Amino acid sequence: MVYSYTEKKRIRKSFGKRPQVLNVPYLLTIQLDSFDKFIQRDPDGQQGLEAAFRSIFPIVSNNGNTELQYVSYQLGEPVFDVRECQIRGTTYAASLRVKLRLVSYDKDAASGTIKDIKEQEVYMGEIPLMTSNGTFVINGTERVVVSQLHRSPGVFFDSDKGKTHSSGKVLYNARIIPYRGSWLDFEFDPKDNLYARIDRRRKLPATIILRALNYTTEEILDLFFDKVSFEIKDNKLLMTLVPERLRGETASFDIEANGKVYIERGRRITARHIKALEKDKITQVEVPTEYIVGKVSAKDYVDLTTGEIICPANMEISLELLEKLSQAGYKNIETLFTNDLDFGPYISETLRVDPSYDRLSALVEIYRMMRPGEPPTKEAAEGLFDNLFFSSERYDLSAVGRMKFNRSLGIEDTTGSGTLSKEDIVNVMRKLIDIRNGRGEVDDIDHLGNRRIRSVGEMAENQFRIGLVRVERAVKERLSLGDLESVTPQDLINAKPISAAVKEFFGSSQLSQFMDQNNPLSEVTHKRRISALGPGGLTRERAGFEVRDVHATHYGRVCPIETPEGPNIGLINSLSVYARTNDYGFLETPYRKVVNGQVTEEIEYLSAIEEGKYVIAQANSNLDNELRFTDAFVTCRGEHGESGLYRPEEIHYMDVSTQQVVSVAAALIPFLEHDDANRALMGANMQRQAVPTLRADKPLVGTGMEKPVALDSGVAVVAKRGGTIQYVDASRIVVKVNEDETIAGEAGIDIYNLIKYTRSNQNTCINQIPCVQLGEPIERGEILADGPSTDLGELALGQNMRVAFMPWNGYNFEDSMLVSERVVQEDRFTTIHIQELSCVARDTKLGSEEITADIPNVGEAALSKLDESGIVYIGAEVKGGDILVGKVTPKGETQLTPEEKLLRAIFGEKASDVKDSSLRVPNGTSGTVIDVQVFTRDGVEKDKRALEIEEMQLKQAKKDLVEELEILEAGLFARVRNLLLSGGFNDKQLENLDRTQWLEQTLVDEDKQNQLEQLAEQYEELRKDFEHKLEIKRSKIIQGDDLAPGVLKVVKVYLAVKRQIQPGDKMAGRHGNKGVISKINPVEDMPYDENGQPVDIVLNPLGVPSRMNIGQILETHLGLAAKGIGDQINAMIKQKQDVEKLRGYIQKAYDLGDGSQKVDLSTFTDEEVLRLAKNLRKGMPLATPVFDGAHEKEIKALLELGGLPTSGQIILFDGRTGEKFERPVTVGYMYMLKLNHLVDDKMHARSTGSYSLVTQQPLGGKAQFGGQRFGEMEVWALEAYGAAYTLQEMLTVKSDDVNGRTKMYKNIVGGTHQMDPGTPESFNVIMKEIRSLGINIDLDEE
């Protein structure tokens, strides 16, 4: 494998035995692709905005004289970039302009000649844009729109599994679900009649729908039944015989023909009998007259002389009726063929309970059901039924729905109309009856072939369409008002409903969520999440076990591990690593194609529907060098996802990778295969809660997924083009681009500005640190700067800690952990949290609020940290209660006492008509002010601080642009210099000239002269571009801010809080092994080994066996080996040993085991080997991919190479006594995470605070500064102790006895410590409640 310069800095040794066939795809594809399809820079009419416009336009007026046509749309460029939108609290969006054409026709002309055409561009609101990382910035906060897993449109056949009726009879039903429009259900009742429901309303006999479709009784019977014809001949009754239909029946009479008895009466008819009948070509057989009694006529029989119907279709035939028919001259009688086994008389029975008799009566019945209480007219009834399923405006199956519909009914063609046809409805009823007759099976709703993904783009399109429909109504009204001479398209369209619909979706839809920004992994996972909840989905309460369960079709599509614990379990899932959606929105996963037992290079993506037909081998099946299966029988998933053994030649496909089953978070757990699934679930979920530490530390034991996650999350800075680092500091990196990657005529310089100390959604700190040095070569796509929780471009959520599994004085009882003080001293788990506090000055009725340092009744000390504008200065250390922004609010005038009047007259007005409403630091918070931002409304005068900030921003912007210009100019002049030197000038001549004069020289060579002129033009362009950019920046900085109505000024203060680890903080490993820190122990008391090296954390060994997450033990052993090798390398470097020896040792470590990725150090230079060695000193990073990890013998060999005991256990000594512990202890390195459940955020104690209005009891919860509930069990405890007075105090003065509270306060102030309890308010509440029931209740106080 060839490594680039940066990759050679640190190479992770992989134990994976299977070669990587397919690279991990870009992890945010699902979001970006979906939104691209919605926006469509080059539109096609099938989807996105274009489709929405085309489905609504043209809008035609009611009289048909004018129409508004759609031509095209154009998206503008956003005014502010993403960063600016976040700071200003605005939405990152682009304006949508649509070209419309208003065409009016001549009324009189029958042909409808065009009278007038007006074309115009119309503004249609703002469309939020997706950032390059798959998020949206809405009102300044980053949000993610989660994809939804919903039931695919189409037709579904299901049964109630015998739960509806007491007899346990299975009732079948069919449901046609469109993409939008009314649902149509067909269902059997316990009496086997077929009913239909529209939109889950009252049921009607299903035949009403058929009659409404203009079918007669005869035609209906024709559609659903085979016929049996009887012939009356010489007073005998002959039946036409179809032998196959007799199978399984019992003969009710002797079946004979030509004097031969084929089947005796009472015998069961078998295949042998049928063969004999077919062999002798028997087509008619005589039957007794009684046989026809009870059969049902298949058509109307009319008396030809009178025209009277003797026997209507669907009537049971009796002997009298037979006589009548015979007399009327009918020789042939057709009846319906039914039997009890597999041809039920369902439709015939249903027709009998059907109240309708023709099309109109059926339409009226449907109208009455849909619109009860309204008088039906023919037109209304017809219009309603037509609009239900046959109008493309009201009903749409969509391409997916049509495809699923046709496939379900076995129709080859998967395309067709979006509305239903007569045939569609009849076919659905036919298939439902077939299923009831025992042919065919019901669908599995939880199969991923029946559930599809609806992503951002599609949901945004639907919302946009809803907005357009609202506009359409308004436009239609406007068009029918007449007076269209002066009207332009702009006058007709109001953009408000459109932008409101879109805004509502992005701002408050259940699926548009506040992005989880704890760390890069949580961002990536959030964007790859799939929810079954949300509009048009399930609800938590209604979802049963089946929906939440893991399904066979989840394999390689949805992760079986990662899902929340709690009420949402199984409803919110995560996409598997390699999964993607196809054009229809179904999830697909890749497989390697197998031909005749040999695996090919070809990779195919299969959806759940297609996969069911094939036999698929697992990724860890054994292959030889020619990619043939070596085993005689291979474990595979066969049809319907059942596992079994198959011969190699029967196999069609093979998995791509061992980690294709799991999601990104689960693929980051090493030795996942050794963990119980429940614990793995916790491990996957807890990695997302890890807080980025001060210094990121790559995991020693990883899985190889760390790099793709860090790269795709977008938190790190990635090189757009290859080149050389020309300049680097903490806030910017400049790259001189390689010649072959530059576009002709550009300066070839890329500048990357880094994000410094900004706040994330979860109040963690986002900071980028360069990881390249001056002069280093870099390639396109390589990491230039690490973001939060990334280390040299690898995900690093926690720290590698030296752990020991042993009890220690009960300090690790029940999952608690003992942590060494050294961990705190070295700041291993110190995290920075940034809080944003804002102060808003509003315009009130009594006057406007003012931000000032002149605050009434506040001492000097409290104002010491404010500047003259009343705003805290940057760098101030503040604690709870300190003033950050001074603000006063006008008070209403009150009646003044004479004394006050006198004071007013002497000391002037101002003092008392304002009250202090300053922004203070919340209790329990302390930190350093790192940034202040002031936003001022247009037209309001800016204060001194705002002007200072503005000036600073201008300076910074100018400095950035000037530096950028200098770098670009330097690059340009370097090329000019080379050109001039090659064109006959020498260094001395050039030194005497000013740089700008170089461009004015003339060269003999015409080609070079042209190049020089081009460069001169570029120089001018650069200058102009610089001026233009500076002007734009300046106008952006100076312009007033767009604030909410009534707001004059907003001041935002950012506090940075540094949190060290302390008892009560929650920590966890990656295997679901979580715990709370019980004690920070002095380093000298920690257990230590023979070399005097103490452990960092002591974990309880009892936490392992019952939880069955053995992965943590293997990780600990492997971590020890990795560290051991690092120590050996470190010793060699310290002893200044020969580079070749060092190279040999490192090569030996990389070669150990039978991993498929080999590292060849012979191609490295000595300098590269040394740099690699220096980076390996703290431990050699290892990768053990999921389900393809390190084996026990490899771990032992690695331990041996590191000079460590192969048992992984070490003799430890007690730090307090120096005595040896009685047996060796498992010691090693485990990757530990600090989770975002910090004791500082949870610790809370109430003093005097707010009370609930009705009950007058203290509120609950930290946010409300509430108390702890003294519930009934606590009351029992005090009762049991007999502590009557304590109990009385708890239930009265400490809770809701209002008078008692005030008396208590008086007593305490007065120095008498006694208590006078009164009546608790909750007692009054219950009295009032009883009175509200009409019962008079009084308290007799004796």
Swiss-Prot record:
Keyword flag Cytoplasm: no
One example GO MF annotation: DNA-directed RNA polymerase activity
Keywords: DNA-directed RNA polymerase, Nucleotidyltransferase, Transcription, Transferase
Coiled coil region boundaries: none
GO cellular component, one term: DNA-directed RNA polymerase complex
A GO BP entry: DNA-templated transcription
Keyword Transcription regulation: no
Pfam (any one): RNA_pol_Rpb2_6
CDD domains: RNA_pol_B_RPB2
EC code: 2.7.7.6
Catalytically driven reaction(s): RNA(n) + a ribonucleoside 5'-triphosphate = RNA(n+1) + diphosphate
Residue pairs linked by disulfide bridges in the UniProt entry: none
Subunit comment: The RNAP catalytic core consists of 2 alpha, 1 beta, 1 beta' and 1 omega subunit. When a sigma factor is associated with the core the holoenzyme is formed, which can initiate transcription.
Homology family: Belongs to the RNA polymerase beta chain family.
NCBIfam families xrefs: PRK00405.1, rpoB
Role of this protein: DNA-dependent RNA polymerase catalyzes the transcription of DNA into RNA using the four ribonucleoside triphosphates as substrates.
Name of this protein: DNA-directed RNA polymerase subunit beta
Record gene name: rpoB
